[in-house]
């Protein structure tokens, strides 16, 4: 009767039932086929019998030393046959292999092995004289050292151990702390060996051993072939990095399978893209797949199968895998695939609850591949290895990777590292998002973004990206790429790009980020050597810039611009302070923004030194505001009446500013309305998937996300500044016909920057939105402005009441004393009033200061009030500001008013609506607000007291709380009659609400205004306290919500 042929899966089940250890399974192959080739290393070959004999001899020596079961044994040998022999010998003796990178210093190796209480190390001739105080056994790879036997002898069988035996301890890289010692069980290796993704290994295969044995993927190189009766072919690092030589070696040795890193594939794409064409299986992993590199490989000569494999050390080699196809290249994204074998993958939210398909969450892995845990680190074990209620798996590993499972096919997409977010100058940044954006410029074959701590005081951290330019790329590729990045990324995510000929790799064949960080520091140091000798005003100023920015600034570079070099608002504030201390002159922040080039700012300083006074606001600026108000005058109003966007056949909303605070809440309210069928959101993003993620994250930030929202969301990648909103002419025209209504909330908001920096997004952006409103069908534009468009008109002009539809020019006199955002709002509103007078279907809403949700307390932790509350709590004091009101209005009330008015198109068009407390008695004075905060702080560790504004400013300068640091110039610069911008808001006028009150008369059941009392303030403070532990942006009053 013929023997039964088992399937691959049946073989695995049989191996699990038999429960034999790895060494015993190898022994079975050696017993059945002793002459089969096991290892090829250059001119040295070992058969299965040879390898058995050498391992058995070394194992006997270990056993004579009374080696305990699972006792750690260090392996310090060069890459090659000795490594294979050493590992096999340790398992023959029932020990645990602890592979060490032989390039590590002795002290590091000693420290790692000491922590494991190791007694023995296996070394080769090259490492036998190192200063390692352990009992050494020498692994000799010379064939003369061993006698040949005719057959494998039964009495040399390895020790009997099970699949639960700890075979290896692999140390993680330890980039931020001591390396973690990860335990690997035999069952984990067996799981991968029998489930090599998509194609099993066959005895005829030759598997490249390319990985350093301290790297867990080397376990595949060694144990996958030996447990399947195949052959290992050792590939040196020198060969691996010479891609043309590697290709020839693969061909000459008949190598069929290789597991390597994404970094090596990227290198091959740049140097010799046909390097892997002879392989049957090529696994890549370790870093996110590079679409550009894969496309190059596919065009030149791909392997038969290219597998994108995923697996942290704690899950042993591979746990997910995806066969890469040309369709992936065309789609621009490569999945990390689906679980292999019996692996279980869960995607969970921060509370550990599984998320629905299509949602982002942390990847948790369960199954046979999961490690028993870290050695001697119980706290990290509790944090990293967890249980999931309702799952058959007892333990899951929290990978720290953020992923998303596709709704369409169940493939899992890698989004980024939970801990690969970095904080640069206060901003939370996903490095993968920066790298992806750089690659999409089409200028580079590879890019690596990283955070570098600058060596100079005050510079803080810098976002740097090293990139490999494509062949044929023009010399100005970097400048071109930066321009493209600025169109799709926030300013703080645009890195300083450094060119490099090829990416350096470390001993694990991954990109060597530490080397790149040091390379940047070295480049900076070389350029900075001669800068300290500069004694001119320009030279001293250049030195100040360099010390603050952490980049070289040659004094001879007339065109150097402080902000184009990457300066943030906080660094601008720091420069103002440094200028005063260095030159003993005062320069306002607005002056810096308007004169940000080195030559112009140096000229201003020289004028100040000579005693020239700064004129606060030129007449030309007033003229510019008036002229900019006419930018849309040439637009022709629609001839047809606007469509009723609330009709069942309509309900298609075009929305800007959806990622902002108010925009997120309005978006959620729109998506909940049954008459709204789709909301197209203009969003800064490199592609729709990224855009959808930004919108989803914006909603989730305030706990607004609901599963059903995704069916109505339409991300439209673009920017306000572009004539066609970044959509292109055809898509622009298509959206103009598609939209039933426009809600325009997108704006740049920065309380320290001038009008010139707000103009592109706010003024020109509104002109572009108006062009969309005029194109296609007639539709209403709902514009959300602010009462700040009047500036400090109560103090400057003496205005006591502001009517809703009154002309804005009468408040122009107050405008120079406010910030650039308020000035841009005045210009936009004046523009819209001119159009409404000509029949344009426009509605304008002017909210007061928008606070958090009145029910949930969810508020913007980065707005002025939140920053003030947190900072005053830290300082223990708040400023007494008489006769000031902020007209606080909760966000849910604001949006309820807007949507109710917007639903009545016929009566709403052509009007302006103030959204402030409905009567003066409900409008809280600023002092009353802060006293409320102080009273809620009583009984805590510190109380908050009111002090004079001057005393508070002195405390502010002394304590410099982080949350107010970017705003200090605004709070301290004296603009008029010795008063600061904030003090000028004394005697705020009453904002008439006649239009709003009339419109709300038809609100079903009436709309009650939520008063800012102690209960509501407590909700806000509690929310801020929870969020204060979360990452904070350096200046959230700085950004464009498009």
Curated annotation (Swiss-Prot):
Induction: Expression is regulated by a complex signaling network which may include cross-pathway interactions mediated by sensing of the cluster final products or shared biosynthetic intermediates. Residues 532-609 form the Carrier domain. Residues 655-897 are annotated as: Short-chain dehydrogenase/reductase (R) domain. It holds the Pfam family NAD_binding_4. Pathway: Secondary metabolite biosynthesis. It catalyses: L-tyrosinal + AMP + diphosphate + NADP(+) = L-tyrosine + ATP + NADPH + H(+). It is an enzyme of class 1 (oxidoreductase). Disruption phenotype: Abolishes the production of piperazines and suppresses the formation of sclerotia when lnbA is also disrupted. GO terms for biological process: biosynthetic process. CDD domains: A_NRPS (cd05930), SDR_e1 (cd05235). GO terms for molecular function: ligase activity; oxidoreductase activity; phosphopantetheine binding. Keywords: Ligase, Multifunctional enzyme, Oxidoreductase, Phosphopantetheine, Phosphoprotein. Its EC number is 1.2.1.101. It comes from the Eukaryota. Residues 29-425 are annotated as: Adenylation (A) domain. The modification O-(pantetheine 4'-phosphoryl)serine is found at residue 569. NRP synthetases are composed of discrete domains (adenylation (A), thiolation (T) or peptidyl carrier protein (PCP) and condensation (C) domains) which when grouped together are referred to as a single module. Each module is responsible for the recognition (via the A domain) and incorporation of a single amino acid into the growing peptide product. Thus, an NRP synthetase is generally composed of one or more modules and can terminate in a thioesterase domain (TE) that releases the newly synthesized peptide from the enzyme. Belongs to the NRP synthetase family. This is Aldehyde reductase lnaA. It comes from Aspergillus flavus (strain ATCC 200026 / FGSC A1120 / IAM 13836 / NRRL 3357 / JCM 12722 / SRRC 167). The gene is lnaA.
């Amino acid at each position: 009767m013929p023997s039964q042929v088992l399937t691959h899966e049946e073989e695995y089940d049989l191996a699990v039932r038999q429960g034999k250890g790895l060494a015993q399974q190898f022994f079975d192959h050696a017993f059945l086929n002793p002459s089969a080739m096991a290892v090829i290393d250059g001119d040295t070959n070992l058969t299965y019998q040879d390898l058995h004999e050498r391992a058995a001899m070394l194992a006997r020596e270990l056993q004579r030393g009374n080696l305990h079961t699972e006792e750690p044994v260090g392996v310090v040998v060069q890459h090659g046959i000795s490594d294979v022999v050493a590992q096999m010998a340790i398992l023959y003796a029932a020990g645990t292999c602890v592979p060490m990178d032989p390039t590590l210093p002795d002290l590091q190796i000693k420290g790692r092995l000491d922590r494991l209480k190791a007694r023995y190390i296996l070394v080769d001739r090259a490492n036998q004289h190192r200063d390692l105080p352990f009992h050494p056994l020498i692994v000799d790879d010379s064939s003369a050292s061993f006698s040949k036997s005719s057959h494998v002898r039964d009495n040399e069988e390895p020790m009997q151990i099970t699949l639960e035996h700890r075979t290896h301890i692999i140390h993680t890289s330890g980039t931020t702390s001591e390396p973690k010692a990860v335990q690997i069980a035999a069952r984990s290796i067996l799981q991968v060996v029998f489930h090599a993704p998509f194609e099993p290994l066959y005895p005829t295969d030759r598997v490249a051993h390319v990985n350093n044995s301290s790297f867990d993927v080397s376990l595949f190189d060694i144990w996958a072939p030996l447990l399947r009766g195949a052959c290992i072919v050792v590939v040196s690092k020198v060969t691996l990095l010479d891609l043309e030589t590697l290709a020839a070696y693969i061909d000459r040795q008949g190598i069929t399978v290789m597991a390597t890193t994404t970094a090596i594939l990227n290198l091959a794409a740049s140097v010799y893209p046909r390097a892997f064409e002879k392989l049957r299986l090529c696994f890549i992993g370790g870093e996110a797949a590079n679409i550009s590199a894969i496309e190059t490989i596919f065009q030149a000569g791909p392997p038969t199968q290219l597998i994108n494999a995923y697996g942290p050390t704690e899950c042993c080699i591979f746990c997910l895998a995806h066969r890469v196809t040309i369709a992936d290249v065309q789609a621009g994204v490569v999945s990390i695939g689906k679980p292999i074998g019996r692996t279980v993958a869960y995607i969970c939210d921060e509370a550990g609850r599984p998320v629905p398909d299509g949602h982002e969450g942390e990847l948790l892995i369960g199954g046979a591949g999961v490690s028993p845990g870290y050695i001697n680190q119980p706290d990290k074990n509790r944090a990293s290895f967890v249980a999931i209620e309702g799952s058959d798996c007892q333990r899951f590993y929290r990978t720290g990777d953020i992923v998303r499972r596709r709704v369409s096919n169940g493939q899992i997409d890698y989004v980024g590292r939970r801990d690969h977010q970095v904080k640069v100058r206060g901003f939370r940044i996903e490095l993968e998002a920066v790298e992806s954006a750089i690659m999409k410029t089409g200028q580079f074959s590879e890019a690596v973004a990283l955070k570098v701590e600058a060596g100079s005081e005050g510079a803080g951290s810098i976002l740097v990206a090293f990139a490999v330019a494509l062949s044929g790329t023009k010399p100005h590729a970097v400048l071109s790429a930066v321009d493209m990045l600025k169109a799709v990324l926030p300013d703080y995510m645009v890195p300083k790009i450094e060119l490099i000929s090829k990416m350096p790799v470390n001993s694990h064949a991954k990109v060597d980020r530490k080397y790149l960080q040091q390379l940047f520091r070295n480049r900076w140091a070389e350029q900075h050597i001669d800068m300290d000798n500069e004694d001119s005003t320009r030279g001293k100023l250049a030195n100040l810039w360099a010390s603050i920015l952490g980049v070289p600034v040659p004094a001879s570079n007339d065109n150097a611009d402080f902000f184009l070099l990457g300066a943030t608002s906080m660094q601008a504030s720091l420069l103002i302070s440094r200028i005063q201390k260095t030159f003993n002159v005062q320069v306002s922040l607005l002056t810096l923004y308007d004169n940000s080039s080195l030559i112009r700012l140096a000229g201003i300083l020289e004028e100040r030194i000579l005693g020239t006074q700064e004129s606060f606001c030129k007449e030309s600026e007033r003229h510019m505001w008036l002229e900019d108000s006419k930018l849309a005058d040439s637009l022709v109003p629609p001839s047809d009446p606007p469509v009723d966007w609330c009709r069942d056949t309509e309900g298609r909303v075009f929305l800007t500013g959806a990622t902002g605070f108010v925009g997120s809440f309005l978006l959620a309210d729109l998506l909940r309305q049954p008459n709204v069928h789709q909301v197209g959101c203009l969003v800064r993003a490199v592609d729709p998937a990224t855009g959808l993620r930004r919108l989803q994250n914006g909603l989730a930030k305030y706990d607004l996300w609901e599963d059903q929202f995704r069916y109505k969301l339409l991300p439209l990648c673009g920017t306000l500044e572009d004539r066609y909103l970044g959509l292109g002419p055809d898509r622009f025209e298509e959206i103009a016909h598609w939209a039933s209504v426009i809600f325009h909330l997108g704006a740049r908001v920065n309380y320290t920057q001038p009008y010139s920096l707000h103009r592109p997004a706010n003024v020109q952006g509104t002109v572009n939105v108006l062009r969309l409103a005029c194109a296609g069908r007639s539709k209403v534009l709902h514009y959300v402005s602010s009462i700040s468009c009047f500036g400090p008109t109560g103090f400057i002009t003496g205005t006591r009441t502001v009517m809703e539809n009154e002309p804005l020019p009468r408040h122009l006199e107050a405008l120079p004393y406010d910030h650039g955002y308020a000035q841009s709002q005045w210009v936009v509103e004046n523009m819209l009033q001119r159009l409404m007078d000509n029949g344009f279907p426009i509605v304008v809403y002017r909210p007061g200061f928008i606070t958090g949700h009145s029910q949930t307390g969810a508020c913007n932790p980065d707005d002025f009030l939140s920053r003030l509350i947190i900072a005053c709590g830290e300082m223990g004091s708040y400023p007494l500001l008489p006769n000031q009101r902020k007209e606080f209005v909760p966000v849910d009330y604001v949006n309820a008013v807007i949507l109710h008015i917007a639903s009545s198109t016929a009566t709403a068009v052509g009007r302006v609506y103030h959204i402030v407390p409905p009567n003066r008695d409900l409008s809280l004075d600023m002092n009353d607000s802060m006293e409320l905060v102080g009273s809620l702080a009583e009984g805590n560790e510190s109380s908050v007291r009111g002090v004079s504004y001057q005393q508070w400013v002195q405390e502010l300068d002394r304590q410099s709380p982080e949350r107010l640091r970017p705003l200090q110039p605004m709070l301290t610069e004296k603009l008029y009659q010795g008063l600061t911008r904030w003090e000028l808001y004394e005697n705020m006028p009453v904002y008439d609400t006649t239009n709003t009150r009339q419109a709300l008369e038809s609100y079903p059941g009436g709309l009650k205004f939520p008063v800012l009392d102690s209960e509501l303030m407590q909700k806000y403070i509690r929310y801020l306290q929870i969020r204060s532990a979360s990452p904070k942006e350096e200046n959230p009053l700085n950004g464009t919500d498009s």
